[in-house]
């Protein structure tokens, strides 16, 4: 039964204040405690960018976070790009804004989609995502779990060329290979190459093909009923705008007496942050201001849990098949374990046996979702 406090207009006496203090437990300060602890610890976010060369990936990242991560980048010739294999490059930078610290990691994929034969060109990328899951699983299962570093990919911005008539086979192959492992946010790159009617047609075509090929891109969560109308309107606009048509620019130009980031053409100026020109502001708001935490939650609660359940299932199946095995066989090929690793595996063996009993319950929960 809740107790309501009625405040009168007269000045409160010391006795009244004592009565109020007696009825105040103090757990209402929990959000403040969590906020202070989170700000002190800082936040981390790993963003992958993928797509063929020349679509403005690095420029868009610079525009989003106002940080140049590609100072030492070497530009390759067309011939070098054709012969280049897919690489995985990480760029990490610490950003601070109003006392809030963010450790941002950008995972770049140079060489993707540039070869003459692009079959299975996404394999190094899927392997990288799996390796981060595996490393986190090992750290989480270890004895020292205080300072686990989260390198899991929380979001993948996939750049689609504006010059085609929809998704290319390599686009479909990439997204289908990763859609169960990472949150994919498709983008139409270099939207200033298209007029508004062409952008609308291309968006409709991409949405149709995403449904046709059964690709699971990141789904915006539904708004709570108690959210204010402005937030609900913003959420509707985000959902209607996907896939986002974006423009990036590191150049400051003058438009109507104001200095803005944009591109200068003979016919006028395209402003990066003008919502009438592109969806850059919507993407930035979604990625940083409204949905960054949800992207991390979906990574942890859905994609990583699927990987973890698969690992546990394989381990317990192996234990069931051969009870004489001293330790479960890891999922991915590993170097020969040392004495400390063997000891750790033996200690975890009993825990894995208990987890086998929980496996059926976990499967049922996943099916219910």
From Swiss-Prot:
Signal peptide as annotated in the record: none
Modification type Omega-N-methylarginine: residues: 168
GO BP, sorted A to Z: adult behavior; cell division; regulation of exocytosis; regulation of synaptic vesicle docking; social behavior
Location relative to the cell: Cytoplasm; Cytoplasm, Cytoskeleton
Record-listed Phosphoserine modification sites: 225, 327
GO CC annotation terms, alphabetical: axon terminus; calyx of Held; cell cortex; plasma membrane; presynapse; septin complex; synapse; synaptic vesicle
Modification note: Phosphorylated by DYRK1A.
Principal place of residence: cytoplasm
Annotated coiled-coil segments of the chain: 338-369
Positions contributing to GTP binding: 51-58, 85, 111, 190-198, 248, 263
Deleted gene: phenotype: Mice have a normal life-span and show no apparent abnormalities, including synaptic properties and hippocampal neuron growth. In platelets, hyperresponsive degranulation phenotype.
A single GO molecular function term of this UniProt record: GTP binding
Region feature G4 motif, mapped onto this chain: 189-192
Tagged with keyword Lipid metabolism: no
Protein's UniProt keywords contain GTP-binding: yes
Region (G3 motif), start-end ranges: 108-111
PROSITE patterns reported for this sequence: G_SEPTIN
SUPFAM superfamilies, A to Z: P-loop containing nucleoside triphosphate hydrolases
Region named G1 motif: 51-58
Keyword line: Cell cycle, Cell division, Coiled coil, Cytoplasm, Cytoskeleton, GTP-binding, Methylation, Nucleotide-binding, Phosphoprotein
PANTHER family recorded: SEPTIN
Family indicated by similarity: Belongs to the TRAFAC class TrmE-Era-EngA-EngB-Septin-like GTPase superfamily. Septin GTPase family.
Record's subunit section: Septins polymerize into heterooligomeric protein complexes that form filaments, and can associate with cellular membranes, actin filaments and microtubules. GTPase activity is required for filament formation. Interacts with SEPTIN2 and SEPTIN5. Interaction with SEPTIN4 not detected. In platelets, associated with a complex containing STX4. Interacts with PRKN; this interaction leads to SEPTIN5 ubiquitination and degradation. Interacts with DYRK1A. Interacts with STX1A; in the cerebellar cortex.
Function: Filament-forming cytoskeletal GTPase. Involved in cytokinesis (Potential). May play a role in platelet secretion.
This protein's name: Septin-5
Gene: Septin5
